[in-house]
Amino acid sequence: MRALLDTSVLIALLDANHLQHPLCHRWLATQQDGWASCPITLNGCIRILSQPQYPNRLPMQTVVRGLQEAMAHPMHSFWPDAVNPLAAHALDWQRLMRPAEITDAYLLALAVQHQACLVTLDQGISLAWVQGATAAHLQVLV
């Protein structure tokens, strides 16, 4: 099953000093079905890694080049943000409790739409947020 990498995983892959850098690289090396990115995860990665407040800040151009190189790999697919979060079959708004959960729920819905799994470092994502999501649609790296 192809994997949509969330922003936290992309950051860990690009930041050699990130605590989860080795874990994410080991996981990626075993991923045989390929991986995907989307505008939300790419923009989030660029924004966070290039912020002056980020502990291992990288110049924006360096982050962009790193992502471009990774995306050139034949195992990569780019997915446009194509889920309507307000559609009746997408997010379960009754189960979302905090605004901070919306992006994670959206990314999970995008993975479900592509019959893929969302790969994250975030242990707080609930399958109940997305209609049709099963355990196969979410992988938390720990």
Language-model segment annotations:
Residues 34, 75-77, 136-139:
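Conserved beta-strand segments of alpha/beta enzyme cores
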Residues 73-123:
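Active-site neighborhoods of divalent-metal-dependent phosphate/nucleic-acid chemistry enzymes
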Residues 53-55, 97, 136-138:
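Short, hinge-like loop/turn segments at secondary-structure boundaries
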Residues 1-37, 49-65, 130-133:
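Short, well-structured N-terminal submotif of metal-dependent ribonuclease cores
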Residues 41-42:
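Short, conserved alpha-helical segments within structured domains
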Residues 113, 117-119, 123-142:
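Charged phosphate-binding loop/patch that engages nucleotide di/tri-phosphates or the phosphate backbone
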